[in-house]
A protein has these predicted regions:
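Short, basic, helix/turn surface patches
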Residues: 40-50, 107-114, 134
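Catalytic cores of alpha/beta
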Residues: 1-11, 17, 26, 95-131
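A broadly tuned preference for mixed-charge, low-complexity surface segments
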Residues: 45-51, 91-93, 127-137
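Conserved anion-binding
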Residues: 2-86
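Ordered, small/hydrophobic-rich secondary-structure cores
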Residues: 52, 58-113, 117, 140, ...
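C-terminal helical cap(s) of enzyme catalytic domains, especially alpha/beta-barrels
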Residues: 27-34, 39, 101, 120-154
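Flexible "arm" and connector segments at domain edges
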Residues: 37, 136, 149-184
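Alpha-helix N-cap/helix-start and coil->helix boundary motif
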Residues: 22, 47, 116-117, 138, ...
Length: 184
């Protein structure tokens, strides 16, 4: 908990817990009890089963079961990555995201495979909370200005932007200014 405390007490607005969700859900519950909406959970799945420890370990826990458990302990935001799609620029796993969005009331952020403006539009139309665009920005597959306009103009769901005042986040390499990731 010391690391979570440190980040949240020193200006970081949200901490994402990944492997801890499957390996130590009690820790996640304590963190959520203390920090509420400032704790999000990252669920990475390989063939629908949750992976941990940098994707080295695949558990016997289904991603929907973990999401439901996290919702029960108070997690409000889940970042979902289909490992097979991550970095492949082949589009997100919309079906798994749709199932996840229907299974829990948590805010769902898509990660993995988002490669075009059309992918962003499809995810928005699925009423997801957001999307992480990594490699597509790095390779130029997504126009940053268009992505931001789509996110701010229509918003994934306007109510979320109004309620939480979320803004797209852009991650850049400090020395070169190269855009590395956009989270909208």
């Amino acid at each position: 908990m010391e690391t979570v405390d440190y980040y949240l007490q020193n200006g970081i607005s949200r901490v994402i817990l990944g492997s801890a969700a499957v390996k130590n859900p009690r820790f996640v519950e304590r963190a959520v009890g203390k920090y509420r909406d400032q704790i999000a959970v990252g669920i990475d799945a390989r063939n629908e089963m949750v992976a941990a420890e940098g994707w080295l370990d695949t558990s016997n826990v289904h991603y929907l079961d973990l999401a439901k458990k996290m919702e029960q302990i108070g997690v409000k935001t889940i970042i979902f990555t289909d490992i097979a799609k991550d970095g492949m620029l082949q589009g997100p796993n919309v079906e798994q995201l749709r199932q996840l969005n229907a299974a829990v009331s948590c805010n769902i952020i898509a990660s993995g495979g988002v490669s075009t403006i059309e992918d962003i539009r499809r995810l928005r139309d699925e009423r997801l909370y957001g999307a992480i665009c990594g490699k597509a920005l790095y390779t130029g597959g997504i126009d940053l200005q268009k992505a931001v306009f789509l996110a701010k103009g229509n918003a994934f769901t306007d109510k979320y932007f109004q309620k939480s005042e979320l803004l797209p986040a852009i991650v850049q390499e400090a020395s070169t200014g190269q855009v590395l990731m956009l989270a909208i």
